[in-house]
């Protein structure tokens, strides 16, 4: 059985945080849900590199916006993929350091899950090739033997 992928989900709105957590957990993800960006940074800074598979956060939050959270998170763990979901979308917001940006309300839960799947897979990297795919001469040698 494959280990569950871990998503750090950050939103100051408890109801939205609860819905996202439920959505992700029912699809097999392990979710660490936090309600403010400072707790998120604390979680990121105390986690070992590679233990978090995705940062999923809101754009507009008190104390620190999503772009700033993503910027600081990537200073700590540069390989951590990040996705921002927000109802407030401007050209500047989309120019942030997040790997994906989805407009809240304009995307379905299925679309959110697909983006999550893609970002987690991208972090993992390409699947390892089988021995025969890495060395085709082994395959032809086995076929002629």
Placement of each model-derived feature along the sequence:
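Hydrophobic/aromatic residues positioned on beta-strands within the core alpha/beta folds
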Residues: 85-86, 104
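Charged docking surfaces used in two-component/phosphorelay signaling
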Residues: 18-26
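Receiver (REC) domain active-site loop signature in two-component systems and cognate sites
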Residues: 61
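CheY-like receiver
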Residues: 121-145
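Active-site residues of response regulator receiver
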Residues: 58
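C-terminal output helix
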Residues: 105-120, 124, 128
């Amino acid at each position: 059985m494959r280990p569950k992928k871990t998503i750090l989900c950050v939103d100051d709105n408890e109801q939205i945080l609860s819905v996202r957590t439920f959505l992700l957990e029912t699809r097999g993800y392990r979710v660490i849900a936090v309600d403010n960006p400072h707790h998120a940074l604390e979680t990121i800074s105390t986690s070992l590199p590679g233990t978090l598979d995705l940062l999923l956060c809101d754009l507009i939050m008190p104390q620190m916006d999503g772009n700033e959270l993503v910027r600081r998170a990537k200073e700590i763990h540069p390989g951590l993929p990040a996705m921002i979901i927000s109802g407030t979308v401007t050209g500047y917001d989309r120019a942030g350091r997040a790997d994906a940006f989805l407009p809240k309300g304009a995307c379905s839960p299925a679309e959110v899950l697909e983006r999550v799947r893609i970002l987690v897979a991208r972090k993992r990297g390409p699947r390892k090739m089988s021995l025969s795919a890495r060395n085709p001469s082994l395959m032809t040698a086995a076929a002629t033997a």
